Amino acid sequence: MSFDSFIDSAWQDTAVNSTAVKRAQKQLSQIFLELNHTPVDILNLGYTNAASLCLQSSGLSVDCEPVKKYDTVLALDEYFTYADSEQHQKQIIADATKLLAPGGVLLASIRDYRNNPVHKRNLGDSSYININNTHYVVVEINRPDHSDRQSWHQTNFVIENDNAATAYELGYRRTLYFKQLAKYCNDAGCKQFGVLKERFWKSPWRRSMEHIAWSRF
């Protein structure tokens, strides 16, 4: 069983789903207004998230596998940090940008690793979530890579009530800084890049806030 299965179970809870989708709806309407962007063809990379569910509930089609060019690509929940090397990270960012049609917008979320280097600590994010009246605590356990200070291996422990725990291997991850993402997007031909002020992303199974960066191609 993968961590995706746990996330899918969270979205089956009506209260979790409704609260997160309403929050995402407000966020996205403000973001797209600020960027003067109207999403039509959307691709979601990585985990199912409140943004993709929100857009689907608005009657829009959201693909999880690329089949064409898109005007909107979502790379939330730190999708670009799931890489085992700098070259791998560059490649997944480049691959995402190639899926954008001219004028398309990429939205990505990342934590502020410069001011909060959580990847250097064994205990990462920890959070509580109630799914269908069952209590869960999600704890990130990190194993820093001492040969590469920007890399670490992550395992998520999910504690259920007071009698069970499941370990999910998330594999190797790599920090991504705003200037890095800006450079990689510029290398891919982006025309505009920015980090949204006072706009933060947080999924129900996370406690830490993530900054939202955008690129227009």
Regions found by a protein language model. Give the residues of each.
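SAM-dependent methyltransferase
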Residues: 110-179
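Conserved SAM-binding loop of SAM-dependent methyltransferases across substrates and taxa
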Residues: 48-59
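A short glycine-rich, Lys/Arg-flanked "PGG" loop and its adjoining helix->strand segment in the class I
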Residues: 89-105
